[in-house]
Design a protein with these regions (language model features):
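ATP/Mg2+-dependent ligation/transfer catalytic cores
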Residues: 1-175, 197
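Metal-centered catalytic cores of metalloenzymes
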Residues: 177-181, 194-197
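A short glycine-rich, hydrophobically flanked beta-strand micro-motif that places a catalytic Asp/Glu
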Residues: 121-124, 176-177, 218-226
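Short, hydrophobic beta-strand segments
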Residues: 84-90, 185-192, 238
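Accessory "access/gating" subregions that flank catalytic or transport cores
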Residues: 151-155, 159-162, 167-173, 187-192, ...
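Short, conserved phosphate-binding/catalytic loop or strand-edge motifs used
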Residues: 123, 179-187
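Flexible loop/turn segments at secondary-structure boundaries
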Residues: 16-21, 127, 182-183, 226-230, ...
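Glycine-rich anion/phosphate-binding loop at the beta-strand->alpha-helix junction
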Residues: 196, 201, 205-271
Length: 271
């Protein structure tokens, strides 16, 4: 797609904290890209900043450029707004700290060895509702259970709203269900090439949180937002496709079905 059917373009990129940072651009100016301060990579969750190497913090907090392919602009979840994931550069070179740069380098390394990384992501999150003191409390869904569905697990239809919005926008949702604790849900997207999968999950999370906010709730993917409840997982399912399109992790001739490459990958993770 291009910019013609949109009033504004929302250019987003993931930072080192997995926060969706970006800017809105008038559609007529979108092809120029945009700029952001490189030193945002020195921020912590508490907004404290320090002289982190590579962030330009002590060099005047310089700008970096955000570029994107106009053909990758897609319908957003706000009226009249298209959305796209951008790449970060400085002086014509990729920003080393940018997560998309790190992932692209890893994908390129596997490609040079003759493999294509394929990834599937399972997300877990809690829905929170406002409490009388201005904070947040667990979503009141006493009928919820692991693998729960329907109104008993989600009385206000938060997941239904996310699912309907996601399908309308072209997200390839594989499944949604209640998870272990009250107000906890699992959302899974279909398997894909590593970069596309990461971009899809990044945008899906942003969309899901904002759809929940529109309904007056907070959707959080924090590892353990409620100390008394179980934590949220993030499951990364990885395989490698060889030049013939086969799963290079699979070897049916072995007792466990794993190839030598798969065992080497597991050993590397453990190391």
């Amino acid at each position: 797609m291009g910019t013609e059917e949109y009033r504004r373009i929302r250019v987003l990129w993931p930072d080192h904290l997995n926060l969706a940072r970006g800017k809105y651009l008038p559609a007529r100016l979108a092809e120029r890209g945009t700029r952001h301060c490189l030193s945002v990579f020195s921020l912590g969750y508490d907004r404290d900043m320090g002289p982190t190497p590579g962030t330009g913090f002590l060099e005047g907090m310089p700008d970096m450029e955000c570029h994107f392919d106009v053909s990758e602009i897609r319908p957003g979840w706000e009226d009249g707004v298209g959305v796209v994931v951008g790449d970060l550069e400085r002086n014509g070179k990729p920003v080393p700290l940018a997560p998309r740069t790190v992932l692209r380098n890893a994908v390129d390394a596997w490609t040079q060895m003759g493999f294509k990384p394929k990834v599937g992501i399972e997300l877990e999150a809690y829905v929170m509702e406002p409490d009388p003191n201005g904070g947040w409390r667990p979503y009141n869904a006493p009928g919820s259970m692991v693998y729960g569905t329907g109104i008993r697990s989600d009385p206000e239809g938060i997941m239904q709203a996310i699912d309907e919005t996601g399908e309308r926008l072209g997200f390839r949702i594989e499944s949604m269900n209640g998870e272990f604790d009250m107000g906890q849900f699992e959302m899974t997207l279909e398997f894909d090439d590593a970069m596309r999968c990461a971009d899809e999950v990044f945008l899906f999370r942003a969309m899901a949180m904002e759809v929940a906010a529109q309904k007056g709730h907070l959707l959080t993917f924090m590892p353990r937002p409620i100390p008394e409840f179980g934590g949220n997982g993030l499951h990364v399912n990885l395989s490698l496709e060889d030049s013939s399109g086969n799963n290079a992790m699979l070897d049916p001739s072995t007792p466990d079905g794993l190839s030598a490459l798969a065992k080497s990958c597991i050993a590397g993770q453990l190391h």
